[in-house]
């Protein structure tokens, strides 16, 4: 019978009555017996005029057991024990005197001891468990400073904690744990701890004896007792005294020497618990033996995977404990533990992956290359390199080096990942201890380059070395050199690795070492007769030149080498030069990185775009850390770059005029970033010169307007198109000058764009709208001072039909519309409605491209308003939605349906809009009463979008309005209304209706 049911009884009402109510209808004999015992006990209580309380039931029951225990048969004892197990938890400790507690303990101990002595089966499991439970409660009632009152009962609980019956044993375990929790730091706690230690000591001796016999199967009961004692130990370790834990740990270490696999996990569990709950002073004396035993255990391939990994974690925990406790001995054990766990990296995946994670935690927690640098962290500290910590690092490196050298197999991903972590943690001291590893990895890279292996992870591993030690040291170890006899190139595989992972190097190194290498390849290629070899050498040369952008990832000497770099590279700026793309990327890297630092309040939030594809988070973060400047350094760098920017700009503008439009994109962004740091007067002078060069200025150097051109004949039309083409080219160039332009130059650019829009019928409109959109985006003063002119201009020019021009026109509208809404919250803005009107009408465009452009414009406005940092962003967003809703009351069905389509777009992108603007859905649904086909189609489309986008709980309040509005159209067969309602909405509505019902 289950005795764990006291939680369903309470001490505020008669227990007998509670039992009768619960079990009177039960057909189980034990329930009848229990009710009979309760009734008999109540009769005794009443006959003696005692109160009907749990204590009275307890006192009478104990008295009955004491007086009749010799005459009670097992079945009767079972019933009495069950009843007592129900009653006793309901008794308040204050109600029971200590004398009565001791007396009751004596009664129960007598029964339980008798059960231990008699043959198995006299007392059933449930009976023993019930009495053990009661004994545990009674011992808890004893005086916590009087061991004599506790000793007898506690001793019996300890004996039953290794009982062969699981339920009895579990009950005894629970009682002992509860008692230790209640003992606290009392005198009784110390005595109880000693008793547990003696139990462990006895069973340690037994385990060693069994191990010596090497026939555990022949001593099964004794073997089980050892396991049970280890099981009871784990939960009470946190409550033992420091001294007891020291002695227990010593016993566990001795038990480890038994080499019995049956005890291993239990021993590990208990050592782990001691590790977690104790100070380093307990671990230190036994650390050496434990570490060596764990290392020995991990080295055996026959041991279970779970236990091996537990041992690895345990060894790591000991290292952590010693390290955190300030015990220098951790340095001695670290290589031993790392070496042992590293052997698991070649095991099956279920072992290798967790082992890899454990090693990463060990390395990240205990190896730091910065410790071996001087205070300024610029040079290696020779004294630190001779210390014990660095000796440990070298020993660990030797472990991995030997692993690579002793194996003929390609290193797996786990080994490479660990090496990556090691490289990054060692940083600038990497070349003092990992040269052998890097050389071996290079050998594998040469082998793998033939296509035998996937080199992605190997390249990433070597990339970590590049990030850690820098390309200068790596190339000193693995030089890229040309064999002049057979023209073979050593370590050519390094070029793409450097291209991806160089950061924080120096332009000086690139100029002094990489450039001469590229030049030598070019010179040698010109002397080679065989075309295949010549092309290979040229490719190597390009590869070296292609490292330019990589060496511009946060170089340390921009302020010193900007001029030298300019002198070297400007001659390469020609239209057909392969260097054009490299130079453009390098300039953007140099300028934008430093600009971002100056503009950013939080450097850690900067993104390194070229590194986002890296899956190794540690590597990416380290790359990011190294690729950063202080604001002071960035300011010096920008100043140096600005001093050369005029020369760069002029050279790039020359390339612009020599190139075809198809190649503009290669260098436009470089021009744009340079103009942003160049003095605006210089920028204006260069642009004015470009206008003259394009032939669009008059005799005094001012812009020459197109003027009236007749397009009646081919000759006049051709002349106009030629003039427009010149202005388009200048507008294309001008779009790169926007950020660094002063107001005068912006006015010039606006004049050219306006001239093109007014004078031509579509030609050049894309370029004109594009530059206007950039001006509006970058210069707020222009938006406020030229609003009327712009609106007049846009009104006078027919909306374009080509997608590019329309997209750029709507980009202008987006900026103006957002500005108008946010700037005039309390007023109606005519310009805003004019803009919105055109976008809404475009939603009804006959072409899919035109409609999509309008959709994108609407979503862009919504996103900007919604995500704005302005305190009134919510208010602005709602105002925009209200403006669209206002069109629903318009007179034109075309504009009404367009407005409904616009709202469909907004709901599709953000269904919550229906909740933040409560009038939205009802306003649309009222249009279902309209007789106009176009409007009805749009509303039915809106309903479909709305129903499929919103949550069922939010749909509930609107469901009846939707159903009442939509269903009447299900009977209209014209214009496909019936099919739209029945097929287009039925599934969505059915699903939502059932969701709302549920």
Named regions from a protein language model:
Residues 1-998:
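Extended, low-complexity, acidic/polar intrinsically disordered regions
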């Amino acid at each position: 019978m289950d005795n764990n049911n006291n939680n369903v009884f309470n001490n505020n009402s008669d227990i007998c009555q509670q039992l009768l109510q619960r079990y009177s209808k039960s057909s189980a004999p034990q329930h009848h017996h229990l009710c009979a015992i309760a009734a008999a006990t109540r009769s005794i209580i009443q006959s003696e005029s005692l109160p009907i309380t749990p204590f009275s039931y307890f006192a009478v029951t104990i008295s009955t057991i004491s007086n009749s225990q010799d005459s009670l048969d097992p079945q009767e004892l079972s019933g009495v024990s069950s009843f007592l197990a129900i009653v006793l938890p309901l008794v308040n400790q204050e109600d029971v005197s200590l004398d009565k507690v001791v007396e009751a303990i004596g009664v129960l101990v007598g029964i339980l001891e008798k059960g231990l002595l008699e043959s198995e089966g006299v007392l059933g499991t449930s009976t023993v468990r019930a009495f053990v439970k009661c004994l545990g409660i009674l011992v808890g009632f004893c005086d916590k400073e009087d061991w004599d009152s506790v000793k007898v009962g506690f001793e019996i609980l300890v004996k039953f904690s290794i009982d062969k019956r699981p339920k009895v044993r579990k009950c005894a375990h629970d009682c002992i744990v509860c008692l230790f929790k209640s003992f606290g730091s009392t005198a009784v706690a110390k005595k109880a701890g000693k008793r547990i230690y003696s139990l462990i000591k006895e069973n340690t001796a037994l385990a060693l004896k069994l191990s010596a016999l090497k026939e555990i199967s022949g001593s099964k009961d004794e073997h089980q007792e050892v396991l049970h004692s280890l099981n009871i130990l784990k939960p009470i370790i946190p409550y033992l005294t420091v001294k007891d834990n020291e002695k227990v740990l010593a016993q566990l270490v001795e038990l480890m020497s038994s080499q019995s696999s049956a005890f291993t996990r239990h021993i590990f569990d208990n050592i782990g618990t001691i590790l977690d709950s104790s100070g380093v002073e307990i671990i230190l004396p036994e650390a050496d033996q434990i570490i060596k035993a764990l290392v020995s255990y991990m080295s055996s391939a026959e041991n279970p995977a779970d236990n091996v990994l537990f041992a690895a974690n345990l060894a790591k925990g000991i290292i952590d404990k010693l390290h955190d406790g300030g015990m220098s001995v951790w340095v001695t054990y670290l290589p031993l533990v790392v070496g042992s766990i590293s052997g698991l990296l070649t095991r099956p995946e279920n072992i290798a992956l967790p082992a890899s994670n454990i090693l990463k935690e060990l390395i990240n927690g205990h190896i730091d290359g910065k410790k071996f640098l001087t205070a300024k962290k610029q040079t290696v500290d020779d004294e630190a390199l001779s210390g014990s910590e660095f000796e440990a690092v070298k020993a660990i490196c030797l472990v991995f080096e030997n692993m690579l050298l002793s194996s003929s197999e390609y290193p797996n991903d786990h080994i490479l990942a660990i090496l990556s972590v090691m490289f990054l943690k060692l940083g600038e001291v990497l070349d003092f201890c990992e040269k052998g590893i890097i050389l071996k990895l290079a050998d594998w890279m040469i082998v793998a380059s033939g296509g035998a292996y996937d080199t992605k992870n190997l390249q990433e591993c070597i990339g970590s070395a590049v990030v850690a030690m820098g390309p200068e040291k790596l190339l000193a170890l693995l030089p890229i050199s040309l064999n002049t006899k057979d023209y073979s190139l050593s370590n050519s595989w390094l070029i793409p690795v450097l291209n991806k992972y160089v950061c924080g190097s120096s332009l000086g190194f690139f100029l002094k070492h990489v450039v001469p290498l590229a030049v030598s390849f070019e010179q040698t290629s010109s002397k080679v007769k065989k075309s295949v070899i010549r092309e290979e050498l040229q490719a190597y040369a390009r590869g070296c030149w292609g490292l330019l952008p990589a060496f511009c990832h946060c170089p340390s000497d921009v302020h010193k080498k900007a001029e030298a770099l300019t002198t070297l590279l400007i001659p390469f700026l020609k239209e057909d030069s392969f260097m054009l793309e490299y130079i453009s990327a390098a300039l953007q890297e140099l300028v934008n990185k430093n600009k971002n630092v100056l503009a950013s309040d939080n450097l850690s939030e900067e993104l390194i775009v070229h590194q986002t594809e890296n899956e190794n988070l540690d590597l990416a973060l380290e790359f990011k850390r190294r690729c950063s400047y202080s604001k002071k350094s960035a300011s010096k760098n920008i100043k140096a770059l600005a001093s050369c920017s005029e020369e760069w700009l002029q050279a790039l503008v020359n390339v612009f005029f020599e190139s075809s439009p198809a190649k503009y994109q290669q260098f436009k962004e470089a021009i744009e970033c340079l103009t942003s740091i160049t003095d605006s007067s210089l920028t204006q002078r260069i642009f004015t010169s470009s206008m003259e060069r394009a032939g669009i200025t008059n005799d005094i150097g001012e812009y020459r307007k197109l003027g009236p051109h007749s397009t009646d004949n081919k000759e006049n039309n051709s002349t106009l198109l030629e003039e427009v083409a010149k202005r388009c080219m200048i507008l294309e160039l001008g779009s790169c000058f926007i950020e660094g332009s002063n107001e005068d130059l912006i006015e010039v650019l606006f004049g050219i764009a306006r001239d093109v829009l007014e004078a031509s019928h579509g030609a050049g409109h894309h370029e004109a709208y594009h530059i206007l959109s950039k001006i509006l985006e970058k210069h707020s003063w222009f938006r406020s001072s030229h609003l009327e002119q712009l609106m007049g201009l846009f009104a006078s020019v027919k909306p374009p039909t080509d997608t590019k021009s329309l997209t750029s026109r709507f980009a202008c509208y987006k900026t103006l519309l957002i500005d108008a809404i946010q700037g005039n919250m309390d007023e109606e803005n005519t310009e805003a409605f004019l803009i919105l009107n055109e976008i809404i009408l475009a939603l009804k465009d006959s072409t899919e491209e035109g409609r999509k452009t309008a959709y994108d414009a609407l979503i862009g406005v919504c996103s900007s308003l919604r995500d704005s940092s302005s305190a009134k962003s919510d208010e602005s967003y709602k105002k925009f939605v209200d403006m669209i809703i206002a069109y629903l009351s318009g007179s034109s069905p075309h504009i009404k349906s367009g407005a409904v389509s616009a709202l469909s777009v907004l709901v599709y992108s953000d269904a919550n809009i229906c909740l933040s603007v409560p009038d939205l859905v009802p306003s649309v649904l009222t249009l279902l009463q309209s007789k106009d086909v176009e409007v009805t189609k749009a509303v039915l489309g809106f309903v479909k979008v709305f129903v499929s986008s919103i949550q069922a709980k939010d749909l509930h309040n609107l469901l009846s309005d939707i159903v009442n509005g939509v269903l009447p159209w299900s009977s209209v067969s014209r214009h496909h209304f019936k099919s739209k309602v029945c097929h287009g909405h039925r599934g969505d509505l059915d699903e939502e209706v059932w969701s709302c019902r549920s």
